C-alpha cells in the first residue's frame, strides 16, 4: 500500500483593499450622481427662474407671445421718451419760453404718463404687432430711410414765437348769446382803429391795455407767451397769421371762428432746431439703438397706414354745414324731479363766502337787508320776468353771474334729489314741484336769499326734434337753451363737417339727412344723444385742424374693429406685478 501525501489546495482570497475600493467606488459614484442631479436641478431652477423673470409671457397677439423682456425693453424706451419730454419742458421754462403755469401743466402730464407707462407700453406692443400685419396686408412698407426721417423729426424742436394779441369781442345784449350785425360792425371798427393807431406810431402796449377786451391778457399788453404751429388752444386763422408775421409787425385784423376780432404781433422767434446728439444721448442713457429703431419703425407703420386712409379723404368732397344739439348721458339719466334753474343771490353785506362761513351772525342787520332786497327783486320779476337776466348780471352777489361774460345766474348742473347743491337750496325747489318758467319766492340758504326761476325739466331729444321739425321751435334757440355741446352758445354751430371727421354714427346721420332738415337722433352709449341740423352742402377740401380730425377719426374707425377681432391676451396680474 502506497501512502501518498494529500495535495494541499490553496483557496484564492480577495485582498481586503478590493472590498474597500468597491465600496468607495459606489459611494463616489452615488455622490457624483447626486452632484450631477443637484446641478441638473439647479440648472432647471435657474432656467425656470430665468424663464419666469425674462421669457414668461405677459400677453400675446394671435398666439405670438409678448415676454417680460419685450415689455421691459418697451417700457424703458417709453420712459426715456418721457424723460426727454421733461428735459425739454425744463429747458423751455428756463429760457422763459414757458410760463410757470404752462411748465407745471406739462410736467403734470408727463407724470401722469409715467404712472401708466407699463400698461401703456404693453398696449403699444400689441398695436405695433397688429399694425405690422395690417401694413403687410395693405402693401405698406417702411424703409430704413423712413426710420431715419422719423428719428430726425423726434430730434427736432419746432419753431416757436412769442406772441401778443389785441382782441375785441362784440358786445351782446343782456340774455343774448350772439351779437347783432351792428354790434359786430362796431367791434370791427374798434379793432381796425386800434390797428391804424399802431401803424401810425402809437405804442402797442398802450393800445392793448386800453382796447383789448380779453381780461386775461389785456393788463399784460396782450402777452400770449410762446406758441407753436400745433397750438390747439389758439384760433386757427389767428395762429396762421402769427406765423406769417414778421417780428414786431402787426397782423391784419383776423376774425376768429368764435366771432372775436384780433390783431397779433410777434416779438421774438426761436427757429426750429435739431439736436445733433439725440441718438448719442439715447445710447448714453442705456437705450439699445436697434431696439429703439424697431419701435420707431412701428410708429412709422402707423403713420403710413393713416396716410393711406386719409389720402382719399383729403380730396375735395361734399361737406355739410351742421348745427348740433347734444345731451350728455348724465343729463339723460337724471331723475324725474330734476330741474334746470337760474338764480339771483342777495347775500348779507354782499359777501356769500362770509355768510356761509358763519362770519356774519344770524342777527346781523345785513341779513334783514338781504331779504328786503330779495323781496323787492321778486316783486319786480313777477311783473316782468324778462328782466331776470339783466338783474342777475347787475345785482347778483354770485360773482360768476355778473357782467356781460357772466352766466346770468344759470346753473350748470340740474337741481335734483341726488345733486350736490346744499339741501337748503335744492329742497325748497323740489318740494314746490315747479313747472317750466315758474318763479319761486325767495329761498334762504347759508349764502343768503335766492330768487329762483325754473327754466326746464330734463329735455327729451326726440320730443325736441318733433317740435323743431313741426316748426314749433327753432333749432338754434333750442341748442342755446338745452345743448351741452361746446358750441351751444353759438346755436350749436359745428361749421363744415366732412365724412370721417366725426364718429361714424354721427357722420352717417348727418349725410343721411336732407339739406335743411334735422337728422335722426343719434345715441352713443356712455356718451349721450345728438341731433343735427344740416344747413348746406358744398364741395370742399379739408385742411388744417379739420384734416387732422379726419386723420385721427378715420384711423380709429378703421383700426379698432380689426384690433377687436385679433386674438389678444393680457396677463394683468404680471403687468400689475411689474408696475408694483
Predicted regions and their residues:
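Peptidyl-prolyl cis-trans isomerase
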Residues: 2-66, 97-580
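Short extracytoplasmic
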Residues: 54-92, 337
Amino acid at each position: 500500500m502506497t501512502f501518498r501525501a494529500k495535495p494541499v489546495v490553496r483557496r484564492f482570497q480577495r485582498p481586503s483593499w478590493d472590498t474597500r475600493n468597491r465600496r468607495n467606488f459606489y459611494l463616489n459614484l452615488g455622490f457624483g450622481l447626486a452632484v450631477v442631479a443637484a446641478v441638473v436641478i439647479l440648472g432647471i431652477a435657474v432656467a425656470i427662474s430665468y424663464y419666469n423673470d425674462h421669457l414668461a409671457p405677459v400677453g400675446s397677439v394671435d398666439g405670438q407671445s409678448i415676454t417680460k423682456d419685450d415689455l421691459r425693453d418697451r417700457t424703458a424706451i417709453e420712459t426715456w421718451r418721457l424723460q426727454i419730454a421733461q428735459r425739454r419742458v425744463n429747458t423751455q421754462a428756463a429760457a422763459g419760453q414757458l410760463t410757470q403755469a404752462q411748465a407745471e401743466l406739462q410736467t403734470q402730464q408727463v407724470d401722469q404718463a409715467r404712472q401708466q407707462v407699463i400698461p401703456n407700453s404693453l398696449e403699444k406692443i400689441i398695436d405695433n404687432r397688429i399694425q405690422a400685419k395690417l401694413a403687410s396686408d395693405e402693401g405698406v412698407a417702411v424703409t430704413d430711410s423712413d426710420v431715419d426721417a422719423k428719428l430726425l423729426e423726434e430730434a427736432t424742436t419746432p419753431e416757436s414765437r412769442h406772441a401778443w394779441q389785441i382782441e375785441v369781442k362784440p358786445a351782446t345784449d343782456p340774455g343774448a348769446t350772439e351779437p347783432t350785425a351792428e354790434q359786430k360792425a362796431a367791434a370791427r371798427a374798434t379793432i381796425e382803429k386800434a390797428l391804424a393807431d399802431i401803424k401810425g406810431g402809437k405804442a402797442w402796449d398802450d393800445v392793448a391795455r386800453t382796447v383789448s377786451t380779453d381780461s386775461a391778457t389785456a393788463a399784460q399788453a396782450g402777452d400770449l407767451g410762446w406758441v407753436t404751429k400745433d397750438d390747439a388752444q389758439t384760433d386757427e386763422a389767428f395762429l396762421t397769421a402769427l406765423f406769417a408775421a414778421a417780428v414786431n409787425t402787426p397782423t391784419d385784423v383776423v376774425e376768429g371762428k368764435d366771432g372775436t376780432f384780433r390783431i397779433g404781433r410777434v416779438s421774438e422767434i426761436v427757429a426750429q432746431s435739431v439736436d445733433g446728439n439725440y441718438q448719442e444721448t439715447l445710447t448714453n442713457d442705456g437705450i439699445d439703438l436697434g431696439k429703439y429703431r424697431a419701435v420707431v419703425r412701428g410708429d412709422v407703420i402707423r403713420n403710413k397706414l393713416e396716410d393711406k386712409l386719409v389720402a382719399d379723404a383729403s380730396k375735395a368732397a361734399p361737406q355739410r354745414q351742421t348745427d348740433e344739439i347734444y345731451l350728455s348721458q348724465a343729463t339723460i339719466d337724471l331723475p324725474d324731479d330734476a330741474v334746470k334753474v337760474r338764480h339771483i343771490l342777495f347775500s348779507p353785506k354782499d359777501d356769500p363766502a362770509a355768510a356761509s362761513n358763519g362770519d356774519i351772525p344770524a342777527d346781523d342787520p345785513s341779513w334783514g337787508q338781504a331779504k328786503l332786497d330779495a323781496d323787492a327783486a321778486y316783486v319786480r320779476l313777477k311783473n316782468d320776468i324778462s328782466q331776470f337776466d339783466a338783474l342777475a348780471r347787475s345785482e347778483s352777489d354770485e360773482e360768476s353771474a355778473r357782467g356781460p361774460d357772466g352766466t346770468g345766474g344759470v346753473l350748470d348742473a340740474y337741481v335734483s334729489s341726488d345733486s350736490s347743491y346744499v339741501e337748503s337750496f335744492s329742497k325748497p325747489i323740489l318740494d314746490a314741484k315747479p313747472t317750466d318758467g315758474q318763479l319761486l319766492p325767495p329761498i334762504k340758504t347759508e349764502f343768503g336769499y335766492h330768487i329762483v326761476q325754473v327754466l326746464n325739466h330734463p329735455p327729451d331729444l326726440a320730443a325736441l326734434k318733433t317740435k323743431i321739425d313741426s316748426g314749433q321751435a327753432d333749432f338754434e334757440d333750442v341748442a342755446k337753451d338745452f345743448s351741452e355741446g361746446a358750441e351751444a352758445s353759438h346755436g350749436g354751430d359745428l361749421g363744415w363737417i366732412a365724412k370721417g371727421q366725426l364718429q361714424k354714427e354721427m357722420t352717417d346721420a348727418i349725410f343721411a339727412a336732407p339739406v335743411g332738415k334735422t337728422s335722426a337722433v343719434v345715441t352713443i352709449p356712455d356718451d349721450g344723444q345728438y341731433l343735427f341740423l344740416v344747413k348746406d352742402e358744398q364741395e370742399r377740401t379739408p385742411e388744417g385742424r379739420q384734416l387732422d380730425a379726419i386723420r385721427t377719426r378715420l384711423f380709429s374707425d378703421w383700426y379698432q374693429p380689426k384690433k377687436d377681432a385679433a386674438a389678444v391676451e393680457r396677463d394683468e396680474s404680471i403687468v400689475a406685478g411689474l408696475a408694483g
